[in-house]
């Protein structure tokens, strides 16, 4: 591991630190990047340190503490490893989707009569499931989240099934009592959480209940409103379209009448289902006796041991959301091969029309498509953004064709995240999607209408807030993860379909516990490293060479490094970044205080000796410092150009400490590498210019002009990093992106925000 030390005590080049009287006034625009907000920044270090666990000053105490913490950390890591292994096992056995059972769909399958003409159900195991899963209050439905629509639908369906076979009268009576006592509550249901096809399916169930003479309050005002809505929606359904092409209407055939089944059978999915709905497929089989429908139903009844889900399969959806959750929870690095398998599967099933929840469903949606596009592009696959045009109409974007309420929070949120991954030359649809989705989400956020029609998650408003406030170019991995640990609901997250359901592979407490343990390990390492960095800083006596707020610079330098490069085995790169940033700041501060570099060329070796590197990388490090220091002597040198040079210095230092750096003249990929350096330098210079334009009260048009230039260069850098030259190590390409995103983050965030993030990421324990 490369290690370096610095000692300024005996360096005559710097002389004595300038006194306040001797210091020359700073020219406008001559502040280092980390101090762009310095005049408004409150002290960061002491405030944060006081909130963190105490860091003993003496070596004896420190060693004693380190030993005890080491034992605790080893135990935590062992626990984390066990959980990671459990997740890995689940990912390796991923199939067509893990989903909870739907009492509603199971009941409709239970109504199917024996094919041989005998008495009783064709699938008796469905009856067994119904009998075994009645809840204590007499209802059926999701046991952990009470939604009246879900309970009424599920309970009524189960009662109809049991009554149809004249069995388990006691359970029927308890279910009926629940319905009688609670039907009125439907009028008070949350509109944003309406079950899919509820107003079509419930009246159909009620008609079946009437035929069975079930004692239900059919005249309840809430039901009259639902019947009226059913008639309104059925009147809007174009029957020619319904029978001619696959649409989402195929998902709710059990609630429709006067259907031409001969035509509809041509619209089945390849697996024999109607839009992957067991209830809809059961109705189709009841009406037609179609063998493929039977094979689909028989397969899922056996797979789920009697019960059936509300939708199946979900092979695409499950893989996408699992990768997304693991990435945002910060533990994706443990599952590189499993994630590669998932995304290879997605890429194989990618179509010009987009994606659906399963590979064989012809009805695509923007949610799966946007998530797929984003993840595939992030992981280096080549996908065309023109696919989003399939979900664009009249300047708006919708989730599914024919939706009565075309826009909901989570599909637009996922599309907004995807739209930010632009490459030069991409179709303008990404830009239009970004504008529309941002406006939509801003409107929902401003009016406090953040409930989603597809999911009931722990903190959707928090997820949207982060995406809106921190664009991808300024979002740092550990910040996103720390906030998402508070937003992710684990097993508490519920999904809305025909009934409420759970996606157990990617919404579970094991993910959450593993991620929290992993992050806790990271925090402990950060505190130890930060403590050591502080001691190194004091021993090196860097503070006496100026800087607006040395403690803040130290804290921010380390935070930016650790927020990007957080893996335990990359401590050398993390600390190398932080130390080089601190040294560069000290040198920059000194030069500004004495009016610029004097006799720099003749004393260059003496200045470089401030950072003696006694290892195999010393030559590369010395060359990197030499080039940075020489930039100060250039006639066209300005603080803006120095910022770009500092970004390159950081990149080179990180690469050197990661053991990946090759001297520029020896690189076989010289042109591609130089392009990455040029883009990095240019973006960071423009970010500095943008901040100054804002602080100096320049016009909005001027700032927007800089933003447009930044966006174009950021698109090019993103393309070169995500899909660039294979001769350049992926980690090397990502280093450029890490440094640029850290500069973006500082430019776009207030000092108070940065302070809060430092506190949250490093010092606030994950509970």
UniProtKB/Swiss-Prot annotation:
Family matches, as InterPro entries: Isoprenoid_synthase_dom_sf, Terpene_synth_N, Terpene_synth_N_sf, Terpene_synthase-like, Terpenoid_cyclase/PrenylTrfase
Keywords: Isomerase, Magnesium, Metal-binding, Plant defense
Keyword flag Secreted: no
Description of what induces expression: By UV irradiation.
Short sequence motif named DXDD motif, residue ranges: 365-368
Pfam families referenced in this protein's UniProt entry, alphabetically: Terpene_synth (PF01397)
Cofactor(s) needed: Mg(2+)
Catalysed conversion reaction: (2E,6E,10E)-geranylgeranyl diphosphate = 9alpha-copalyl diphosphate
Entry remark concerning the domains of this protein: The Asp-Xaa-Asp-Asp (DXDD) motif is important for the catalytic activity, presumably through binding to Mg(2+).
Record protein name field: Syn-copalyl diphosphate synthase
Native organism: Oryza sativa subsp. indica (Rice)
Gene from which this protein is expressed: CPS4
């Amino acid at each position: 591991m490369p290690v370096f030390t610095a000692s300024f005590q005996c360096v005559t080049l710097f002389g004595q630190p300038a006194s306040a009287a001797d210091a020359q006034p700073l020219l406008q625009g001559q502040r280092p990047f980390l101090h762009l907000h310095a005049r408004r920044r409150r002290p960061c270090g002491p405030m944060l340190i006081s909130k963190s666990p105490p860091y003993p000053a003496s070596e004896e105490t420190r060693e004693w503490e380190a030993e005890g913490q080491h034992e605790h950390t080893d135990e935590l890591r062992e626990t984390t490893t066990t959980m990671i292994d459990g997740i890995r096992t689940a990912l390796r056995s991923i199939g067509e989707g893990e989903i909870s059972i739907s009492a509603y769909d199971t009941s409709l399958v239970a109504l199917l009569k024996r094919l041989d003409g005998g008495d009783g159900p064709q699938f008796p195991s469905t009856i067994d499931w119904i009998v075994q899963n009645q809840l204590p209050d007499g209802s059926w439905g999701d046991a952990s989240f009470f939604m009246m629509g879900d309970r009424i639908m599920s309970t009524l369906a189960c009662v109809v099934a049991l009554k149809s076979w004249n069995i388990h009268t006691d359970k029927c009576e308890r279910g009926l009592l629940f319905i009688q006592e609670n039907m009125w509550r439907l009028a008070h249901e949350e509109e944003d959480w309406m079950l899919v096809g509820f107003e079509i399916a419930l009246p159909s169930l009620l008609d079946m209940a009437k035929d069975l003479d079930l004692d239900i309050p059919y005249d309840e005002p809430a039901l009259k409103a639902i019947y009226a809505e059913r008639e309104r929606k059925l009147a809007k359904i174009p029957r020619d379209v319904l029978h001619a092409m696959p649409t989402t209407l195929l998902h709710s055939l059990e609630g429709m009448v006067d259907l031409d089944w001969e035509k509809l059978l041509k619209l089945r999915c390849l697996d024999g289902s109607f839009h992957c709905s067991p209830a809809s497929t059961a109705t189709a089989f009841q009406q037609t006796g179609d063998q493929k429908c039977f094979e689909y139903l028989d397969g899922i009844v056996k797979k789920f041991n009697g019960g059936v889900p509300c939708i199946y399969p979900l092979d695409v959806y499950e893989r996408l959301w699992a990768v997304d959750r693991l990435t945002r929870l910060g533990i994706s690095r443990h599952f590189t091969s499993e994630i590669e398998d998932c995304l290879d599967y997605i890429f194989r099933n990618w179509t010009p029309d987009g994606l659906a929840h399963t590979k064989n469903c012809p009805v695509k949606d923007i949610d799966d498509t946007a998530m797929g596009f984003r993840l595939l592009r992030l992981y280096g696959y080549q996908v065309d953004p023109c696919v989003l045009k399939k979900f664009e109409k009249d300047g708006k974007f919708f989730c599914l064709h024919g939706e009565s309420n075309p826009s909901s929070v989570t599909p637009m949120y996922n599309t907004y995240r995807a739209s930010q991954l632009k490459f030069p030359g991409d179709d303008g649809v990404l830009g239009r999607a970004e504008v529309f989705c941002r406006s939509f989400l801003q409107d929902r956020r401003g009016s406090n209408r953040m409930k989603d029609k597809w999911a009931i998650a722990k903190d959707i408003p928090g997820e949207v807030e982060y995406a809106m406030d921190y664009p991808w170019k300024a979002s740092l991995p550990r910040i996103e993860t720390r906030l998402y640990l508070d937003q992710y609901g684990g097993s508490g997250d519920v999904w809305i379909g025909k009934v409420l359901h759970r996606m157990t592979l990617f919404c579970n407490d094991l993910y959450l516990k593993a991620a929290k343990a992993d992050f806790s390990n990271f925090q402990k390492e950060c505190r130890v490293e930060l403590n050591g960095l502080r001691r190194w800083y004091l021993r090196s006596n860097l503070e006496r060479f100026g800087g607006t707020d040395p403690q803040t610079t130290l804290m921010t330098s380390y935070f930016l490094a650790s927020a990007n490069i957080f893996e335990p085995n990359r401590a050398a790169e993390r600390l190398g970044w932080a130390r080089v940033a601190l040294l560069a700041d000290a040198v920059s501060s000194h030069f500004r205080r004495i009016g610029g570099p004097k006799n720099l060329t003749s004393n260059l070796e003496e200045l470089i000796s401030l950072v003696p590197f006694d290892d195999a990388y010393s030559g590369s490090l010395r060359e990197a410092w030499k080039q940075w220091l020489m930039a100060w002597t250039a006639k066209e040198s300005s603080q803006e150009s120095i910022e770009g040079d500092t970004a390159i210095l950081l990149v080179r230092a990180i690469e050197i400490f990661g053991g990946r750096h090759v001297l520029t003249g020896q690189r076989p990929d010289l042109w591609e590498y130089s392009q990455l350096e040029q883009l990095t330098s240019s973006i960071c210079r423009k970010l500095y210019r943008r901040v100054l334009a804002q602080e100096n009260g320049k016009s909005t048009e001027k700032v927007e002009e800089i933003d447009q230039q930044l966006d174009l260069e950021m698109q090019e850098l993103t393309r070169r990093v995500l899909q660039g030259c294979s001769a350049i190590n992926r980690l090397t390409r990502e280093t450029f992106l890490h440094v640029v995103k850290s500069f973006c983050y500082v430019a776009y965030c207030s000092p108070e925000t940065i302070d809060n993030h430092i506190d949250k990421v490093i010092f606030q324990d994950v509970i």
